[in-house]
Amino acid sequence: MKVSVISLFPEMFQAITQYGVTGRAIKSGLVEVDFFNPRDFTHDRHKTVDDRPYGGGPGMLMKVQPLKDAIASAKLSVPNAKVIYLSPQGRTLTQEGVQQLAKQAEFILVAGRYEGVDERLIQSEIDEEWSIGDFVLSGGELPAMVLMDAVSRMVPGVLGKQASADEDSFSDGLLDCPHYTRPEVLNGEPVPSVLLSGNHEEIRRWRLKQKLARTFQRRPDLLQNLELDKEQQLLLEEFIRETEDSTSAE
């Protein structure tokens, strides 16, 4: 997968290009990332990339020309790549969206600054707008890093074992189950005995039931959009009965 990033602060991306899962993916060649700074595409001695908005108002807007030229330069190596603008007005990024983006071999990310970019650039150059939530940040770099990290995890070979991605929260529409490691007993709390049993089928069912239970308790809205299979439905009903029995016994 190849990602081209357009940003005024490419140095910020060292947090994911040099460390952790994404850093290893880049070093191994599974993910390729390059950067284009709009300041390098300005034509004045001050390298001006922003200007005042027409109609007045607070803040500045990023100018079209430096961004447009940066996008054109990025497209020289990835001519068929979609251009994605990170914006609070975009489609909210979910695991489903991450999986869709991961099917693309290449894309260009535009990280805005100030009060945003000239609308005419969005109309002429941007293919998709994505948001990481209903809140405002100082720029698009952090959302771009979030998107890059999430999508990189889906690239075959990045996590070593594909099961790691398949079992993440939201990969099947559910929250993840609880996990435990040594010691076996911590502050009087033991690891659930089923996880020590060696019975892989029972462990699988326990984990699935815990995922359903946690989703039911913490994010019931997610279940409204899922078509549970017969096993999932039975396990969820079993958990609900157990919860009701426990409540009535108190």
From Swiss-Prot:
Per UniProt, the keywords (alphabetical) are:
Cytoplasm, Methyltransferase, S-adenosyl-L-methionine, Transferase, tRNA processing
Instruction: Name its cellular compartments.
Output: Cytoplasm
Q: What class of enzyme is it?
A: transferase
Reaction(s) the record says it catalyses: guanosine(37) in tRNA + S-adenosyl-L-methionine = N(1)-methylguanosine(37) in tRNA + S-adenosyl-L-homocysteine + H(+)
Write out the GO biological process terms: tRNA N1-guanine methylation
Record Pfam families: tRNA_m1G_MT
Source species, domain of life? Bacteria
Q: Where does S-adenosyl-L-methionine bind?
A: 112, 132-137
Task: Spell out the GO cellular component terms annotated for this protein, sorted alphabetically and separated by semicolons.
Answer: cytosol
The protein's Enzyme Commission number: 2.1.1.228
Q: Name one GO molecular function term.
A: tRNA (guanine(37)-N1)-methyltransferase activity
- HAMAP family documented for this protein: TrmD
Q: Any idea what job this protein has?
A: Specifically methylates guanosine-37 in various tRNAs.
- Subunit composition and interactions: Homodimer.
Family of this protein:
Belongs to the RNA methyltransferase TrmD family.
Instruction: From the Swiss-Prot or TrEMBL record, give the protein name.
Output: tRNA (guanine-N(1)-)-methyltransferase
**Organism, as annotated:** Marinomonas sp. (strain MWYL1)
Q: Which gene encodes it?
A: trmD
